[in-house]
């Protein structure tokens, strides 16, 4: 009994710490922006219909106008920009891979500086949306809104880091999950239920929701748990001539190795672009017609969304799984990939293997995006809103990832205590 208590104690403490931080983060949603008093009117009349709300929904932000409205969106944008710099400039790559802890701290510092910059940019878009709903608006109001939401976003970034380091799971992902759960009743188009006066239509819509949720659960699990394995043989096995399956090692490459990052990045970029274009006074007429048309907007959104998801699936997987690093580690362990020569051939093989796994993962993520719309067309009901589909995908993926991390932490504790 005592051993079991010692085993579970640290895990329980981490879970408790995580829950308390998430509660604290949710309380921040009720802290208004100084000087913004017409919150309820603005919220009910238009906020839920804006791209800013959708962007906030996908980044752990508030579902009302508060200091946490921007959520973690600016941080995601800054992280993406820094990762591009790491890949494009050798100096940044050296900082991340060769400078050790000091180099990583420098990368984190650059990310935080860019986060502040993106906060300021997005806060001015938010300010433009607020102008017509706030009395006595003046130039100082821009700076008040910018300071308030920038501070709120940076606090969320700090809380996410605390969860990641001292809690359970990925902090930013859990903040997004809690935000999605809190606005679950808003994920479905309001008109969907208002128009369901006929019993048969109501039953069809319930069937649609159930099938959609089950399909998302299945495809999300396949994406997170499915993997391809690279067979690895040690030098000792080669010398002894023993290569049986029982003693063979593998390097697992998950289909969804990039996790929910491709969806978060794709959603953030697309919503930021559409918001920016809509607010341009001299935007091209054809462009504005496309964005203002619901059907065309869905076609444009889905096509661009799928392309971005596929791109970021490949891009981010190659960032977190570098073929060169894997080849170096194999060399250090005196191991080789079966039937592959060490050196350049190994790097090429690993890169090809990772790209194949990423392709399958991107197809699974794309299927998750398309399934709700296909089912809605087949059953003749209104589809889930675009932001609703994305939020559900994120929620399922984050839950799967968090459960896996909890189990991994528990197994690690058991191993350490038994050794």
From Swiss-Prot:
Q: Which Pfam families match?
A: SecY
Q: Where in the cell is it found?
A: Plastid, Chloroplast thylakoid membrane
Chain ranges passing through the membrane:
19-39, 64-84, 113-133, 143-163, 167-189, 202-222, 255-275, 299-319, 359-379, 380-400
Question: Which SUPFAM superfamilies does the entry link to?
Answer: Preprotein translocase SecY subunit (SSF103491)
Gene Ontology annotations for the cellular component aspect, listed alphabetically: chloroplast thylakoid membrane
The record gives the membrane topology as: Multi-pass membrane protein
Any Gene Ontology biological process: intracellular protein transmembrane transport
Q: Does the keyword Transmembrane apply?
A: yes
What keywords are assigned to this protein? Answer: Chloroplast, Membrane, Plastid, Protein transport, Thylakoid, Translocation, Transmembrane, Transmembrane helix, Transport
The organism's superkingdom is given as Eukaryota
Q: Which InterPro entries match?
A: SecY, SecY/SEC61-alpha, SecY_CS, SecY_dom_sf
Biological role: The central subunit of the protein translocation channel SecYE. Consists of two halves formed by TMs 1-5 and 6-10. These two domains form a lateral gate at the front which open onto the bilayer between TMs 2 and 7, and are clamped together by SecE at the back. The channel is closed by both a pore ring composed of hydrophobic SecY resides and a short helix (helix 2A) on the extracellular side of the membrane which forms a plug.
Cite the record's note on assembly. Component of the plastid Sec protein translocase complex, which is composed of at least SecY and SecE.
Could you tell me which HAMAP family the record lists for this protein?
SecY
NCBIfam families, per the entry:
3a0501s007 (TIGR00967)
Q: Which family does it belong to?
A: Belongs to the SecY/SEC61-alpha family.
This protein's name: Protein translocase subunit SecY
Origin species, per record, is Diacronema lutheri (Unicellular marine alga)
What is the primary gene name for this protein? secY
